[in-house]
Every structure is written in structure tokens, then in C-alpha cells.
UniProtKB/Swiss-Prot annotation:
This is Subtilisin-like protease SBT2.3. Residues 28-146 form a propeptide. Keywords: Autocatalytic cleavage, Glycoprotein, Hydrolase, Protease, Secreted, Serine protease, Signal, Zymogen. Residues 1-27 form the signal peptide. It is found in: Secreted. GO terms for biological process: proteolysis. Residues 61-81 have a biased composition (Basic residues). PROSITE patterns: SUBTILASE, SUBTILASE_ASP, SUBTILASE_SER. It comes from the Eukaryota. GO terms for molecular function: serine-type endopeptidase activity.
Length: 840
């Protein structure tokens, strides 16, 4: 039986060292009828990180104490000196197993997982799978990518930055690693030209900067301290385009440059787009170090084998935090979603002390759309903030239509006639010849005399979202036709896509609402005068004025959970059974975020050639949290990943800037017209609160051994746990569910009868007395003990929570436990339950 798992979900996170060894050249890859492919092979011997001696804090104690038996129980600490022997053992193993055969080894994985990536055929894969040393063979799979003002919205200038000593040192000494599309090293957001304070030398970092023609010597500096690229899987497949994708850490896409600047970009960088200053940018942790591991590319996305190599290298280099704005196309198959090369490698990264942040995914708002699964990964959803660049269109009938677009206004006090692109065609053009003429992409389709001096109405279709048509091209057409401005109305088929404000170098507006677009067209059509006999158009009577959208206002109710942000419950498997784990962990600003942009990016034509771009998605939310995590790590260097996670979660905000409960968008059609009170399935613990996270009061600790116990509690997981981690599940192991983990939340997918859950908390603040309050989920009675306790610094307190089913619930219901300290600390614990009364 061939032990080969076919896996095709499109996100991956793991780490490896870059070792390219080939027994033949790429020209010898395969014949036309060959079935060769890239496989990720993991071996049963543990990676280097599992050989490390545990260095736990004296006060740290695992809640669970299973009798775990690693294959190698050596207490000796292993470091870089171990790497050559691991790589040599891989080569020796392959030579013996595939003696005389052609194959390409792309990478050796050794730090977080023990294995390699190979380009082989199916017969060779089967031969490898029969070897007792092999744990898993997985087909390589594709992966994809998933501020000026947000630091102010998050309260950093008056809060967290003040606690750190000011923005001048916020995040200093902490290294954030980014697995993304690379970086533009010449961007001012990443220079080290701080004349007042030089950057310290990171003593715990061993990474390097690649030197290539497009990433020359000197690209890195005292802030950007590491940069590598990983593309061997793509190269082996023959799809790597070096002129477009750049065989270097240089960012040809823009996404990686953007995310890095959101987390750790320099403070006070002017955001100038289309010659207009939109403010001054800053990362959340502007003094943090940046190390870049490029594994995604503009033309094809990325592949698991390359991403795995990037993460393994990042861990080996010594990063403190990993930010991953990438998500899967589908849920991992197998026993549980947690058992995939990515999450297993990230579990090893957490064991090594790395805090891992991942985007939730942009597949909301339906339930169970979560793309980040495991409890050791901190999952971030996307929310709005209160800044809005308002633009509007005032019609001749005194109706005002809201819209968007970074555009200048039409002349004050003056109305201009409008003309639809379909009515502006020249005599040689028709819709029959070009069905896309309404998108205003070709100057030669139009009659300049008809358009000159008017507002040209164009259709914004799905082709704009796909990059087949562009705002920039439509504006160029309008200028060549001497139009006064451009109005874009939305095509109904664009529903479900987030549209960001776009720079316009003339008066213009995008109307993102279908209903508002209908209002515009109804007025326009009703104002057309026709000849009574011939029905030919005599004149266009509709007039309008564009207000312009260059100025921001800050009156928006925020935050709101964005409709596209992936939702819980967390799916445990491909049958969509619920895991007893809260996802997302929280939400952070992700909508309409200014960030640095690569000088070579053509990913967004509207921002091509600009130094900044506005983007939306959970990709933008995750680096906000990575930056806050860097601030926490700076204040508490001894904090483990789970402690950082706890500090972020228990301090999250539940109310918006108006003092009301945070709302969530329910649908992508007119999302702000379908708001409802956000639940933990939408926003996790709430909205990130950077200032409070630096002083959480009580923290919840969860160890690597706890996570292993959790994995061992999954039915049929014994062999998988052993193959991935090297730990054997005890024969008499008491099952541990997600709700048993010492997490700052309680999530029960099926609650029947009465169950009691315990949470252990450690006080990292001064002596304090806490009062405990709670609100039970629907269909459940709740009792929490103790209702009051006093605790000294360094002491632990166990909280006992008893839930009893009183009514059936067909879906998740939500409650909350609040701990209120007499010195001001507040600890929030969300409770999510599906209650089931057992049938008699």
C-alpha cells in the first residue's frame, strides 16, 4: 500500500534551510509521459528543535503531564553544528533508496521538521513510502497570499508607545520574520537613517541577506537584517519567470512590502500618492527588526515546498515573531485539519519560542470559512477603522450618492452634463463588436465631440477586479476625450469583492453600491430627450457634480468585522465537524490600509509607480497583531508564545468607538445595511487592544506538551502524532479536547448534561483582588468559582467553570466570563457552546 497523501490546499507555513542539490539538470526532468512531481517527505527522526533542552520558566507548569516518549531523549542542546550531518544523512538515504535513479532534491528540512522536498515520479514516491524511516509523503501544493492612521485608531501614541518609551524605541530588539512576496529594500519605510538613535545589533540572529543583481550588496541595513528567497519548487516546474518574479528577495508584487511596513515600517514616512500627501505612515512596532523570507510570487503564487523552506530558515535564523498573510485554498484532508505539514512545523516553531500570527482568510462571511486552524497559531480576522475618504456625486435632482476615489472635485458650484459610454460611441463601434465598451478602456471606440466637457459614465465590472480592465486606463481614455471627469457605476456581478479607494488624476468617483448605481442610471435615462417621431436622442439632460475624495474624516463607527473576514467555528476536519478551539483569536484593522508599495509592482495598476498603496484583507490585519506582539515581546522578553497570545486575547475590546457592541457585516451585498452584533465566531475575543495587552494582569500558559496531549486526544491520531512529532501517545491516555487546553476561551462544540472546565491563570502584575462575573450562553446555566479571589505577583489561580444544558441550541450560542481587578485589570474569557439535551 502506497503511503502517499495527495494534498492540494493552497496555504502553507513551515520552515527549512535552503539546500539545493540535484543529481541531474532541469533539462533532464521528465519526458512528456512522465508523472514526476514535487513531494514533501518527512522522516521519523525528530528535527533539531525537538532535540533542544527545554528552557521553561521556573513558574511555568504544564496543565497536563502525559508520559510522552520522544524517540531521542537526549538532553544535549544541538545547534548549527548539527545541520551538516542532517543534510548528509538525507543525501545518503536518498542515494541508497533511489540508487542510480534521477531525482532532484530541492531542500533539506531539518530545524522544525526532518525531511526534504524532492522532484520524483510516482514509482519513486512509492519506493520511498515503503522505507521504515519515512513518516509521510505529501504532494507539493500551491499557496496564495490572503498604516498612516491605524496606530492612532489603536491608541498607540497615547498608550502602548508611551509605555515602551515612545515610538522612537517601540519594538526595538525584536525580530519579525515575514513569509510573503519579498520586500523593496529601497523604500524609506525600511531605511536605518535614524540620526537620533542607532539600531542595536541583534545578538540572537544568524540570518543573512542574499546578494543578487536586483538585490545588490547594501540592500539590507541595520533595520532590514535578513532577506532570502525560496523558489526551487517553481523553478523545477519550469514556471518561474525571473524577469517578473525576481530570483531574489526583491518584491515584484507589492504584498510583502505592504505587510512588512504595517507591522514594522519606520515612523513618520510621508504617504504621497498622485502628488497628494495623505499623512505620515508608521508601523505598529517601528523600531522592530525585519527579516524577509520570500516564498510567494506575482505570476504563480507559491508552493508548499518553498514556503516550508522559508519558515524553517526563519526559525533557524532566530526570529521572535512570524507573520504569515497566506491562507489555504481548501481544508487539509486526513484525520484532522491540524495534521498538515504547515501546522505541524509551526507547532515546532512555537516550541522554539516563536509567536506565529496568521491571517484568517478572506472567505467570509459564512460560518466555518476559517482558513487557520490550530490552537498554537494566533489567527487574525479583519475589521474596519474609523477613517473614511468620502467622495460623493450630487445629481441635478438634488440626490447625493456616496462613493469613493482619491480624486479632486469638479469646479465648485457648477454642474456638468453626463454621458454614458454607450451613448458616446463613434459610428464604427458597437456593443456587438466590443461587449466591454462600457468599461472605457479604448479611446478609439468613442466620439470626442460627444464626450468633451462632460462627465463620462463607465461600468465597473469584474474585469477590473481581475485586472483585465483598469481605472487608470479609463481615466487616460477620458482625458484623451477631453472629459471633465469619470463616474464608475458598479456591475451587480462585482458583489463579494472589496473595492478600495483609487487614486485619480482628474475628477472621478466609484459608486460601490448596486442600488446607488441604479439610482444614477435611472436619473440619467429619465433625463434623456428624444425626438417624438424617430426616438433618436436629441440631448442629454442629466447633470452632476463630483465632491472629490482626497480628505479623510474620522466619524465612522468602528471597528466592524468585515464581511470578507473568515468566520468560525473552527472546522476540525473536512466533514466540517466543529473543533473545540476558538477561531479567529481576535480582529485587527484590515480594511483600507495604507502601506508601503514596491517600486516594481504592477499588481495594482492604480498604484503602479507609487511608494504607497491602499489594500484590504486579513493579510493587512495579521501584521498589525505581529507588531503588537513585538511590543509585548519587547516589554516581556521571557513571555512564551502562549503568554503573548493570552495577553492579546484577554485584553481585547468588546465595544466600538461609540461605546456600543462591535458589529459585524453579515453579507457582501450592501454590507453596512446588514449589521449584527459580532460574536466570538466573527471576532474571537474582540478587537486588538495594544495598550492593555502590555499590562494584562493575568495570563494563561499553554505548553508544547499540552498541545501534544490535545493532538493525542483526536480519534485515530496516534500514528499521525508519532510521525509528525516523534512523540508516542500513551496507551492509557485520557482524551484531551480543545476545551481542556488552558486557553483564554472555552469552546464546546457539543455540550450535553453538565461539564466542568478549569483554567489556570498566573498573575504578572502586583497584588490584586478580582471579582468574577459572567453571562451564560443561550440554553446553558453557568457557575464560576471562585467569585472573588486575591492574588499576589507570580501566584496562580484556578478558575472552575461549570456549564449545564437547559435547552437545545441548533447553532453556537455565546457567553462571557469577566474578571475585574481592583487596580483596573480586566480579563475577558469568551464562552462558545452548542447545547444538546440528551434524548431519553
Amino acid at each position: 500500500m502506497v503511503r502517499v497523501m495527495l494534498v492540494r490546499f493552497g496555504f502553507l507555513l513551515l520552515m527549512i534551510s535552503f539546500v539545493f542539490l540535484s543529481n541531474n539538470t532541469l533539462g533532464q526532468q521528465q519526458d512528456d509521459d512522465d508523472d514526476s512531481a514535487v513531494y514533501i517527505v518527512t522522516l521519523k527522526q525528530p528535527p533539531i528543535v525537538h532535540l533542544f533542552e527545554e528552557q521553561e520558566l521556573k513558574h511555568k507548569k504544564s496543565k497536563f503531564t502525559p508520559k510522552l516518549r520522544p524517540r531521542n531523549n537526549s538532553r544535549k542542546r544541538h545547534g548549527k553544528s548539527k545541520i551538516p550531518s542532517v543534510v548528509q544523512s538525507h543525501d545518503s538515504f536518498l542515494r541508497k533508496t533511489l540508487k542510480g535513479e534521477k531525482y532532484i532534491k530541492l531542500y533539506s528540512y531539518h530545524y522544525l521538521i526532518n525531511g526534504f522536498a524532492l522532484f520524483i515520479n510516482s514509482q519513486q514516491a512509492e519506493k520511498l513510502s515503503m522505507r521504515k524511516e519515512v513518516a509521510n509523503i505529501v504532494l507539493d501544493y500551491s499557496v496564495r497570499t490572503a498604516t498612516t492612521y491605524t496606530p492612532q485608531f489603536m491608541g498607540l501614541p497615547q498608550g502602548a508607545w508611551v509605555k515602551e518609551g515612545g515610538f522612537e524605541i517601540a519594538g526595538e530588539g525584536v525580530i519579525i520574520g515575514f513569509i510573503d512576496t519579498g520586500i523593496d529594500p529601497n523604500h524609506p519605510s525600511f531605511n536605518d537613517n535614524d540620526s537620533k538613535r542607532s539600531y542595536p545589533i541583534p545578538k540572537h540572529f544568524s540570518g543573512v541577506c542574499e546578494v543578487t543583481p536586483d538585490f545588490p550588496s547594501g540592500s539590507c541595513n541595520k533595520k532590514l537584517i535578513g532577506a532570502r528567497h525560496f523558489a526551487q519548487s517553481a523553478v523545477t516546474r519550469g514556471i518561474f519567470n525571473s524577469s517578473e518574479d525576481y530570483a531574489s528577495p526583491f518584491d515584484g508584487d507589492g504584498h510583502g512590502t505592504h505587510t512588512a511596513s504595517v507591522a514594522a515600517g519606520n515612523h513618520g514616512v510621508p504617504v504621497i500618492v498622485s502628488n497628494h500627501n495623505f499623512g505620515y505612515a508608521s508601523g505598529i512596532a517601528p523600531r522592530a527588526f525585519i527579516s524577509v523570507y520570500k516564498a510567494l510570487y506575482k505570476s504563480f503564487g507559491g508552493f508548499a515546498a518553498d514556503v516550508v523552506a522559508a519558515i524553517d530558515q526563519a526559525a533557524q535564523d532566530g526570529v521572535d515573531i512570524l507573520s504569515l498573510s497566506i491562507t489555504p485554498n481548501r481544508k487539509p484532508p486526513g484525520v484532522a485539519t491540524f495534521f498538515n505539514p504547515i501546522d505541524m512545523a509551526l507547532l515546532s516553531a512555537v516550541k522554539a519560542g516563536i509567536f506565529v500570527v496568521q491571517a484568517a482568510g478572506n472567505t467570509g462571511p459564512a460560518p466555518k470559512t476559517m482558513s487557520s486552524f490550530s490552537p498554537w497559531i494566533f489567527t487574525v480576522g479583519a475589521s474596519s477603522h474609523d477613517r473614511v475618504y468620502s467622495n460623493s456625486l450630487t445629481l441635478g435632482n438634488n440626490v447625493t450618492i456616496p462613493g469613493m476615489g482619491f480624486a479632486i472635485p469638479t469646479d465648485s458650484g457648477k454642474m456638468y452634463k453626463m454621458i454614458s459610454a454607450f451613448h458616446a460611441l463613434n459610428n464604427s463601434t458597437s456593443v456587438d463588436k466590443d461587449m466591454y465598451v462600457g468599461e472605457c478602456q479604448d479611446y478609439e471606440n468613442f466620439d470626442q465631440d460627444r464626450v468633451s466637457g462632460k462627465l463620462l459614465i463607465c461600468s465597473y465590472s469584474a474585469r477590473f477586479v481581475l485586472g483585465l480592465s483598469t481605472i487608470k486606463q479609463a481615466l487616460d481614455v477620458a482625458k484623451n476625450l477631453s472629459a471633465t471627469g469619470v463616474i464608475f457605476y458598479i456591475d451587480p456581478y462585482v458583489l463579494g469583492f472589496e473595492i478600495n479607494p483609487t487614486p485619480m488624476d482628474m475628477p472621478g468617483i466609484i459608486i460601490p453600491s448596486v442600488e446607488d448605481s441604479k439610482t444614477l442610471l435611472k436619473y440619467y435615462n429619465s433625463s434623456i430627450q428624444r425626438d417624438v417621431t424617430t426616438k433618436e436622442i436629441v440631448s442629454f439632460g442629466a447633470v452632476a457634480a463630483i465632491e472629490g475624495g482626497l480628505n479623510a474624516n474620522f466619524s465612522n463607527r468602528a471597528p466592524k468585522v468585515m464581511y470578507y473576514s473568515a468566520r468560525g467555528p473552527d472546522p476540525e476536519d473536512n466533514s466540517f465537524n466543529d473543533a473545540d478551539v476558538l477561531k479567529p483569536n481576535l480582529v485587527a484593522p484590515g480594511n483600507s490600509i495604507w502601506g508601503a508599495w514596491s517600486s516594481a509592482s504592477t499588481d495594482s495598476t492604480e498604484f503602479e509607480g507609487e511608494k504607497f498603496a491602499m489594500m484590504s484583507g486579513t493579510s493587512m490585519a495579521a501584521p498589525h497583531v505581529a507588531g503588537v506582539a513585538a511590543l509585548i515581546k519587547q516589554s516581556y522578553p521571557q513571555f512564551t508564545p502562549s503568554t503573548i497570545s493570552s495577553a492579546l486575547s484577554t485584553t481585547a475590546l468588546l465595544n466600538d468607538n461609540k461605546g456600543s457592541p462591535i458589529m459585524a457585516q453579515r453579507t457582501y451585498s450592501n454590507p453596512d445595511q446588514s449589521l449584527y452584533t459580532a460574536t466570538p465566531s466573527d471576532m474571537g475575543s474582540g478587537f486588538v487592544n495594544a495598550t492593555a495587552a502590555l499590562d494584562p494582569g493575568l495570563v494563561f500558559d499553554t505548553s508544547f506538551e499540552d498541545y501534544i496531549s490535545f493532538l493525542c486526544g483526536i480519534n485515530g491520531s496516534d500514528t499521525v502524532v508519532f510521525n509528525y512529532t516523534g512523540f508516542r501517545c500513551p496507551a492509557n491516555n485520557t482524551p484531551v479536547s480543545g476545551f481542556d487546553l488552558n486557553l483564554p476561551s472555552i469552546t464546546v462544540s457539543t455540550l450535553s448534561g453538565t461539564q466542568t472546565f478549569q483554567r489556570s491563570m498566573r498573575n504578572i502584575a502586583g497584588n490584586e483582588t478580582y471579582n468574577v462575573g459572567w453571562s451564560p450562553p443561550y440554553g446553558v446555566s453557568m457557575k464560576v468559582s471562585p467569585t472573588q479571589f486575591s492574588i499576589a505577583m507570580g501566584e496562580n489561580q484556578v478558575l472552575s467553570v461549570t456549564l449545564t444544558v437547559t435547552k437545545n441550541s441548533s447553532s453556537s450560542s455565546f457567553g462571557r466570563i469577566g474578571l475585574f481587578g481592583n487596580t483596573g485589570h480586566i480579563v475577558n474569557i469568551p464562552v462558545t457552546v452548542i447545547a444538546k439535551i440528551a434524548s431519553s
